[in-house]
């Protein structure tokens, strides 16, 4: 789960991380009054959406008067902001965060993430802040600093001190950076976060460190322990199909292609998406129905896939281990009769009760294209659309 920048900063401040402050606007009628609360010479108007690249897309504006700030805020509120992370459809701006500007002497990048490849928490930092860290990693990887934390010992003083020295801080800034490292680590652990990112972390004209932007991503599996974090959820920022799928117990991620996929198992789902690409098409989604799906869940999965108007065909790829192929077949038929599948449908079944499942599909009277293996299935669905 993601939250907005202003919410992330509020959490960081609770843990002692110094951040820039401002006012939140959730409706246009509040804009003027909110800006009047700020006593500053420079105003920063920020669109609050769950996507990066806001600055390049016009979602962050710096102005030098109240009148300009009010005009920019009114113009920005409600627009559809398109960044490299939103996709071409963009994201509607329903919230603004308006801050007092500050003089920046230097920008840094700082984050703490769970590194799955190393199975530990890792700090990532760079002297190149204020830009996409992926761009820095690609062009100047030597400027990326990493410190991994042994889960057996936890964060140690040398981690914090090492990061401060590697970033080139001196004197009181070393102490400030150490405190920021310790505070973000504590926040990461106690909130069950998957990532905390501060970009940029700046040195202001007084020589002090300040988090100018912040991002939190939380581990969905830990949210049941944190009702206060769940309360920060903004469903307007989430894809409605993904929300609907989650409510149905399905793992669904919308993509930009034309072939809908329904698969059991995340690994098989990714392999299915790969082979669709190999045969020259693009998947419209990732959808894992899970190992214990019943007829109703299969039916709901197909309904969700068909709710995407870009879907021109559907590939069902099921390996029946825990799941029975006859149950899948019955769910497909029920969905087809209920909602009327009008796009090509290719079904590949293997495993438990596979012959029974194939027989059910064959006797259904529906236009279902059978496939005997994954390559055959991918070839047939690409040809059919």
Swiss-Prot record:
What does the similarity note say?
Belongs to the succinate/malate CoA ligase beta subunit family.
**Organism listed in the record:** Rickettsia bellii (strain OSU 85-389)
Q: Name one GO molecular function term.
A: succinate-CoA ligase (GDP-forming) activity
Q: Tell me the route in metabolism or biology where this protein functions.
A: Carbohydrate metabolism; tricarboxylic acid cycle; succinate from succinyl-CoA (ligase route): step 1/1
Sites binding substrate sit at 264, 321-323
Output a single Gene Ontology CC term carried by this record: succinate-CoA ligase complex
What does the UniProt cofactor note say? Binds 1 Mg(2+) ion per subunit.
Q: Where are the transmembrane segments?
A: none
Pfam families, per database record? ATP-grasp_2, Ligase_CoA
Outline the subunit composition. Answer: Heterotetramer of two alpha and two beta subunits.
Among its keywords, does the record have Metal-binding?
yes
Protein name (database record): Succinate--CoA ligase [ADP-forming] subunit beta
Q: Which reaction does it catalyse?
A: succinate + ATP + CoA = succinyl-CoA + ADP + phosphate; GTP + succinate + CoA = succinyl-CoA + GDP + phosphate
One Gene Ontology BP term is: succinyl-CoA metabolic process
Q: Which PROSITE patterns match?
A: ATP_GRASP, SUCCINYL_COA_LIG_3
The positions making up the signal sequence are none
Q: Which InterPro entries match?
A: ATP-grasp (IPR011761), ATP-grasp_succ-CoA_synth-type (IPR013650), ATP_grasp_subdomain_1 (IPR013815), Succ-CoA_synthase_bsu_CS (IPR017866), SUCC_ACL_C (IPR005811), Succ_CoA_ligase-like_bsu (IPR005809), Succinyl-CoA_synth-like (IPR016102)
Q: Which UniProt keywords apply?
A: ATP-binding, Ligase, Magnesium, Metal-binding, Nucleotide-binding, Tricarboxylic acid cycle
Ranges for the ATP-grasp domain? 9-244
Q: Which cofactor does it need?
A: Mg(2+)
UniProt xrefs under PANTHER family: SUCCINATE--COA LIGASE [GDP-FORMING] SUBUNIT BETA, MITOCHONDRIAL, SUCCINYL-COA SYNTHETASE BETA CHAIN
